[in-house]
């Protein structure tokens, strides 16, 4: 009986290190996130003979994953920002994060925008960091009467805007991506494929559903300066409404935050974690997914991939763990 053979490739600043590392590799872990967090690559390498040099921080690692039968899938480029050497036995641990998140994007700034659009702000951020803006049109035309960036990095601003509009807000592959979560499309409008997984595809699963998170609406507050009093807006119904603590500058901003929070609440009611025995490098966050062969509640629910963790090691081969949220 033949078994599938995992395949991987690691390139350091243009030099392919795969053959050199392969006999020493304990495990390779790649975590892909939807936004707000950088994708992360972790390598653990055995250094029993002390012949491996410690990599320098700031070097670039490119990684590809797959199977010998189907080939490799490029998973991006990462910058080494953490190195650990421990023993005995001697082990080198290398941690790298998305190469697109440069130090300049983490530098704090002070500025404001007036009478503009969300698309204009995001285009400015992309241009300053030599990124290609990929902003969904439905969000790009949103009006922003005022926006402050006070002692805040561009990356934090991008994340904050993603929270405000319930959007994927990230930097990947040389592009600044901003698109509605769960839309099933890329920022350019191209449809993402829906994946179907059966119970036979995995060896571990965990499903949970909780009424405590089943809010019927979200109420947000804003300060009416003309009337010098606190007002509120409600998105959804008031039967069991969640109340946001922060007070916003105007009604439109409060409504945007309430709408975004309600969408997050809906996705968080049911959760499904699934580990695939045969890793799938083609899976990534924001893909829609359907399940088959589980309980009725799982099979009838449409799912959205929130996070994927790919692991290659000597004992389990290549596996992929999915964190799924319920999708409307």
Q: Where is each model-derived feature located?
A:
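Short beta-strand-centered interaction patches in the first periplasmic/extracellular domains
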Residues: 4, 91, 97-100, 137-202
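Short, compositionally biased
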Residues: 77-86, 111, 302-314
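Conserved "cap/hinge" positions at secondary-structure junctions
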Residues: 65-67, 180, 287, 293
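Extracytoplasmic/secreted envelope proteins and their assembly/folding machinery
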Residues: 77, 119-122, 155-159, 217, ...
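Short solvent-exposed strand/turn elements
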Residues: 91-107, 316-328
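Amphipathic, non-transmembrane alpha-helical segments in extracytoplasmic/periplasmic proteins
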Residues: 42-43, 96, 110-134, 148-172, ...
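An acidic/polar, Gly/Ser/Thr-rich interaction patch typically located in mid-to-C-terminal regions
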Residues: 24, 28-56, 201-328
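Assembly/oligomerization scaffold segments
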Residues: 1-103
């Amino acid at each position: 009986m033949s078994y599938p053979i995992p395949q991987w490739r690691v390139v350091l600043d243009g030099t392919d290190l795969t053959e050199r590392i392969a006999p020493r590799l304990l495990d390779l872990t790649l975590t892909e996130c939807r936004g707000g967090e950088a994708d992360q690559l972790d390598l653990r390498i055995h250094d029993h003979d002390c012949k491996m040099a410690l990599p320098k921080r700031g070097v670039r690692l490119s990684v590809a994953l797959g199977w010998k039968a189907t080939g490799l899938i490029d998973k991006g480029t990462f910058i080494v920002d953490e190195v650990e050497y421990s023993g005995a036995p001697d082990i080198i641990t290398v941690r790298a994060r998305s190469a697109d998140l440069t130090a300049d994007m983490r530098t704090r700034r002070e500025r404001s925008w007036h009478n503009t659009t969300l698309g204009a702000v995001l285009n400015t951020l992309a241009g300053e960091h030599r990124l290609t803006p990929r902003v969904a049109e439905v969000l790009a035309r949103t009006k922003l009467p005022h926006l402050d960036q006070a002692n805040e990095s561009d990356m934090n601003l991008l994340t904050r805007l993603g929270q405000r509009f319930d959007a994927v807000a990230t930097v990947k592959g040389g592009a600044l991506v901003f698109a509605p979560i769960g839309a099933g499309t890329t920022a350019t409008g191209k449809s993402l494929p829906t994946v179907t997984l059966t119970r036979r595809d995995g060896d571990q699963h965990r499903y949970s559903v909780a009424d405590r998170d089943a809010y019927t609406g979200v109420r947000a507050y804003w300060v009416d300066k003309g009337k010098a009093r606190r007002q509120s807006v409600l998105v959804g119904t008031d039967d069991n409404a969640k109340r946001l603590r922060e007070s916003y500058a105007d009604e439109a901003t409060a409504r945007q935050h309430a709408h975004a929070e309600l969408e997050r609440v809906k996705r968080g009611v049911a959760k499904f974690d699934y580990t695939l025995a045969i890793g799938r490098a083609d899976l990534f966050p924001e893909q829609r997914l359907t399940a088959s062969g589980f309980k009725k509640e799982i099979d009838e629910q449409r799912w959205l991939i929130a996070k994927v963790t790919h692991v290659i090691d000597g004992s389990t081969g290549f596996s992929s763990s999915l964190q799924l949220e319920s999708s409307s």
